[in-house]
Amino acid sequence: MKEQKWIHEGLITESLPNGMFRVRLDNEDLILGYVSGKIRRSFMRILPGDRVKVEVSRYDSTRGRIIYRLRNKDSKD
């Protein structure tokens, strides 16, 4: 049976060593996020101020996996 996970959106507030980030979720929770392997392989750069989607386990709601970086509205990409 596959573990159910919650998906939240949040804002990167701080960059930590080894691909870890401090993420403030939209519900004002502060969690520790780590980059998923798919994002790590595609060499995406995640910086403080970026909006991301985070997958949070129901068993440990203090850590989450960053699964998607949302586009900034003001960027020229």
From Swiss-Prot:
Keywords: Chloroplast, Initiation factor, Plastid, Protein biosynthesis, RNA-binding, rRNA-binding
Similarity section: Belongs to the IF-1 family.
UniProt KW rRNA-binding keyword: yes
GO MF entries: ribosome binding; rRNA binding; translation initiation factor activity
GO CC term (a single one): cytosol
Protein name per its UniProtKB record: Translation initiation factor IF-1, chloroplastic
The species this protein was found in: Garrya elliptica
Domain (S1-like): residue spans on this chain: 1-71
Gene: infA
Known role: One of the essential components for the initiation of protein synthesis. Stabilizes the binding of IF-2 and IF-3 on the 30S subunit to which N-formylmethionyl-tRNA(fMet) subsequently binds. Helps modulate mRNA selection, yielding the 30S pre-initiation complex (PIC). Upon addition of the 50S ribosomal subunit IF-1, IF-2 and IF-3 are released leaving the mature 70S translation initiation complex.
Source species, domain of life: Eukaryota
